[in-house]
């Protein structure tokens, strides 16, 4: 199975917010709100936004399958950066970087992810563009839902 071609989804997105980095960081790290903000996050067991934390996640998006994975926060620098590794049905890395802007702050999300297990693996192999659209849907809707829920 590992010999089959995989499709990696690379992402590098920037989002402008009209609040300071500190205010944005406070909102982003309210992990007890994640399931309220994002209804497609079916299960989430995170307790803290801190280096060394392991979060078990189950995502059910618009496609007819779920993704189960673990996020390990490897580096967290308050109001600056968080870097994580993902393992499970999705593998790879993700990085969140906050920067000052003329009016407020900028959140940059970079990632390199590949489906490694479950039905997502087959969808990715057979329909790379569908996997990319699903990834984009989660990111785009996630930011929109975050903005609506937090007001930032």
Predicted features along the sequence, with ranges:
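Hydrophobic ligand-binding cavity/cleft-lining segments
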Residues: 1-50
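Intrinsic-disorder/low-complexity, polar/charged segments enriched in Ser/Thr/Lys/Arg/Asp/Glu/Gln
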Residues: 8-16, 54, 68, 81, ...
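Glycine-rich portal/gate segments that line the openings of hydrophobic small-molecule binding cavities
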Residues: 4, 45-90, 141-152
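Hydrophobic pocket/interface hotspot
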Residues: 24-28, 34, 55, 73, ...
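Beta-strand/loop substructures that line and gate deep hydrophobic ligand-binding cavities in soluble
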Residues: 85-140
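A short, structured loop/turn motif at beta-sheet edges
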Residues: 18-22, 46-51, 74-79, 97-106
